[in-house]
Amino acid sequence: QPLAAETHDSQPAAIRLVTEARGDDGSVGCAAGGLPGDMHKLWRPATRGSYHMEYGNSTMGDEIAGGIGVAMAEPERRVHVMVGDGSYLMLANEIMTARQEGVGLTIVLLDHHGYRCIRNLSDACGAVNPFNDFRARDPETGTFTGEVLPIDFAANAASLGAEVFTAGTPAELETALRDARAVTGRPAVIVVETNPEPGVPAYDAWWDVPVAEVSVSERVQAARAEYEENLKKERSFV
C-alpha cells in the first residue's frame, strides 16, 4: 500500500502556494523537519518580520504555539503556520489555545504519513528504519510495514476547535488557502494529503553527519566508505 498518490500535492508546491496566498501583509512560521530547509530555499518574504523560523534546535511542536505568539503580537497580519504531521502530533493541543484566545491563523498541515526528514537522513546513512513511516506493525514480520495508519487529522483539528479544510491537489490547496483566510477569531487548519517523494535539490555543501564505523549491514558499510571519502575533502575556515 503506497503512502500517497503521485497526483497529491508536494511539499515544495505547497510552499509556493502558501507564498502566493500570503499576500503583502502575511507571515509564516515553521520549526522542524524538512520544511525549514525547503523554505530557506523557496520562501520569499514580502516584508520585514514576515518570516519566523526556529531551526537551530529543530523544536518539533513549536510551530503552532509560535504561530499563536506571532498572531497575538501582530494581529494585523495573517499568520500561516506550516507543519508536518510528525511535528503536529507533538503539540496539536495548542489549537485549543488559539480557539480559547480567539486567535485567527492558518495552519497548513502537510500529511506525509510519517517522519520524512529523519527517514531521508537515515536512508542516507545506510539504515533501513521502517518505523519512520506511520504504518501498522506486520504480525508476520514484526516490522512497521503493514497498512498505513488511518489517522484522521481533520477530525482531530476540528475536535480542538479549528475550522478545517482538506486538500489533496494544488488546485484544492489554493482554494482552501483562500477560504481559510476568511476565517477570523479561531484557527483554520488545512490538512494537505502530500506526496513525500518530490523534494528540493540540496545545496552544493556537504553535511558532515557521521556514519557508524562498525556494522554488519552492507548499506551502512557503503555509506561509511562514502563518508570517509567526503571527510578528506572537508576544509575548516575557522
Question: Model-derived features: where do they sit?
Answer:
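Thiamine diphosphate
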Residues: D38, L42-V238
